[in-house]
Amino acid sequence: MAALFDVKDVTFDYDGIPALRGLSLEVGAGEGIALVGANGSGKSTLLRLLDALCFPSNGTISFCGQRLTPGLFERNGFAFSFRRSVALVFQNPDVQLFNSTVFDEVAFGPLQLRWAREQVTAKVEQTLELMGIAHLRDRAPYRLSGGEKKRVALASVVVLEPDVLLLDEPTSTLDPRSQSQLIDLIQGWKGASAKTVLTATHQLELLEDIADKVVVLEEGRVAASGTPAEILSNHELLLRANLVHAHKHKHGTLTHSHPHFHSHSHGEHEH
């Protein structure tokens, strides 16, 4: 599998505070990768770097063999091609919703990429139906619920049919039905559509549904990578990375412990 992204020894600082520390990672075309880690482990920062919204303090990130630099994006041809191929959905949908209606929000990206107006209208209508938000087409995004905003943000990316989807906590704020629909979409993207999908998530119970490979981040570094089954069975790793906690039970004079998943979006524990 050819390397689509090649991340080499990347460091990134926020005002002198390190967010990533010597992180290296290869992403193959068509891979479905889940990024997991506690808050502050570097998941969102890595996705922003892969989307070239910022650039490494040290180290390099290459896309299709070209090193991503500010200068490269000053070339309109490359910037246009990259933005057509790679798309990021932020954890907080308010960051990317700014148009007056849901329809205009989903149409914004295709229009910026100079699609024909007739093509834009047809594709937006199709995407609104796909994401279950056709009834919201004339609503103002800022008046929507958190889950509705998340679906609009996803639609604004899905409509572009990018080759690479970078999803930051995409299931947060979604109701169970919408979450299930999104998982089906992710499976389709990384299956028949052969898209590359990187998903940052806290929800370990979703890993086997959304990823072929799991990368565990800890303090801005790659702590481990493997299949979902390999990562989920490594309780010592999950405890150290603060993805589960040990829960003790006492039965008479006997005490035993077992791990609980941190299910942040539902506020529940899972065994």
Predicted region positions:
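H-loop/switch region of ABC-family ATPase nucleotide-binding domains
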Residues: 201-202
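Conserved beta-strand-loop-alpha-helix hinge in the C-terminal portion
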Residues: 221-243
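Helix-to-loop junction immediately C-terminal to a conserved catalytic motif
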Residues: 51
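Conserved ABC transporter NBD signature motif
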Residues: 59-71
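Conserved ABC ATPase "signature" region
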Residues: 118-136
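Catalytic Walker B motif of ABC-type/P-loop ATPase nucleotide-binding domains
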Residues: 165-168
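Conserved ABC ATPase signature
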Residues: 140-144, 148
